[in-house]
Regions:
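Helix-breaking motifs and short loop linkers at transmembrane-helix boundaries and internal kinks
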Residues: 32, 64, 85-90, 258, ...
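Cytoplasmic helix-loop-helix junction between adjacent transmembrane helices
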Residues: 95-132
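Residue-level signature of mid-helix packing/kink "hotspots" within the transmembrane helices
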Residues: 18, 46-54, 138-139, 240-244, ...
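Conserved MFS/SLC helix-loop-helix module at the cytosolic interface between two early adjacent transmembrane helices
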Residues: 51-87
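A late C-terminal transmembrane helix in Major Facilitator Superfamily
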Residues: 315-344
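Extracytoplasmic gate region of multi-pass secondary transporters
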Residues: 20-21, 196-240
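Helix-loop-helix hairpin linking two adjacent transmembrane segments in secondary transporters
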Residues: 129-173
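C-terminal transmembrane helical hairpin of 12-TM major facilitator-type secondary transporters
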Residues: 260-305
């Protein structure tokens, strides 16, 4: 019951999380601000939601993780759901920063609980299920936000909050979840930032940087090629759907083949597929198949890295989950602004080709990670 409940909360948490970007034009009109000022809302939510995740995990490893896993999505839902209710921009900025803290608390504690309460021989599958549930929410977020706000106004978003509030209340009715024995100390926390977990983080960050840059640049690249908006939307949908399926498949395969084998294997195949994306004609319909294969392969390692980190640090599962999830994506995302300037200066292909080289050290880091004995069914 607990993994399924957490998967639902992940779907709804990330559904609400993805309300903000598509509604920026409406918020700009409401508050009379420009895009640069409105972008502060995105920055406030993203920074607290991503970069605070290891520290949210540090807290979750010391208190009742069930409480934090329930509180986090409630903060996100109330923050995003109330965007049409605040009279001042500054108030909304503070509320969304607080919502980001909620997202950080949920991802770290939720992934930790799923990894610990799933059957050990199926840990990879359940972490994949948890991850793909979040991807589903991210995909639906813009559709739901634009439909509700377009039909009934920004204020109507608040009526969606029971999607989170009711399951969160149900989670609170379950028994408390605290670690037995002595909690991890500060020296244990510092150990996470070196050794095998640090190698996993480095690998995941390099991989995220390459593919975040590619997927973010894709609409601009297509536009320079004269491809239609419809084909661009189709390509992004194919990539998003294949990423979700890849997440689900990756953890499941790692239960059978081993975590390290899946990580190294996906990176080994990922580089030639990535090069194919850069040099194969994007207007060819077969390009969509290549895009789907690459999207699935490069996202398959996300839950696998989390599962392996939890097995390497069983006393700090929330901390390492936060490090390998939001902190990885947030850290990689910080680099996209300078990458965008490089693309403007030198062109899409040279910059994306240069970024592809980063998959080689990512592969080497994955090869260097120690896999605990018998991760399949420990």
């Amino acid at each position: 019951v607990l993994p399924l409940l957490l998967a639902w909360l992940h779907t709804t948490n990330d559904l609400f999380s993805n309300f903000l970007t598509p509604l920026l034009p409406k918020l700009m009109d409401r508050f009379g601000v420009g895009l640069g000022t409105a972008g502060l809302l995105v920055s406030a939510y993203s920074l607290t939601g991503s970069l605070l995740q290891p520290f949210a995990g540090l807290l979750a490893d010391r208190v009742d993780r069930r409480l934090l896993a329930a509180l986090g999505p409630v903060l996100v839902a109330l923050g995003m759901g109330s965007m049409g209710l605040w009279p001042r921009f500054e108030a909304l900025l503070f509320v969304l920063a607080l919502a980001g803290v909620g997202s950080a608390l949920f991802h770290a504690s939720g992934a930790s609980l799923v990894g610990e309460y799933a059957p050990k021989e199926r840990r990879g599958f359940w972490l994949s299920f948890f991850g793909s549930a979040g991807n589903l929410g991210l995909s639906l977020g813009p559709i739901v936000a634009l439909y509700v706000a377009g039909r009934w106004g920004l204020e109507a978003l608040f009526w969606l909050t029971p999607l989170v509030l009711l399951p969160a209340l149900f989670l609170l009715r379950l028994p408390p979840v605290r670690r037995a024995g002595r909690p991890a100390g500060f020296r244990d926390f510092l150990r996470v930032f070196r050794g095998d977990v640090a190698r996993l983080w480095g690998m995941a960050t390099l991989r995220s940087l390459v593919f975040l840059s590619f997927s973010t640049t894709l609409p601009y690249w297509y536009a320079t090629k004269g491809l239609s908006d419809g084909y661009t939307a189709l390509s992004l949908s194919v990539y998003s759907l294949s990423a979700t399926l890849g997440i689900l498949a990756g953890g499941t395969l790692s239960d059978r083949l081993g975590r390290k084998a899946v990580l190294v294997g996906t990176l080994t195949l990922g580089l030639p597929l990535y090069l194919g994306l850069l040099f194969f004609p994007a207007e060819n319909p077969l390009y969509l198949l290549l895009l789907a294969a690459t999207g699935a392969l490069m996202n398959a390692g996300i839950p696998v890295a989390v599962a392996l980190a939890q097995e390497l640090e069983p006393g700090q599962t929330a901390t390492v989950s936060g490090l390998l999830m939001g902190f990885t994506w947030g850290f990689a995302g910080l680099f996209y602004a300078p990458i965008g300037r490089l693309i403007e200066a030198f062109g899409v292909l040279p910059v994306l080709l240069g970024l592809g080289v980063l998959l080689l050290p990512a592969w080497a880091l994955a090869r260097g990670v120690r896999e605990p004995a018998r991760t399949m069914g420990v």
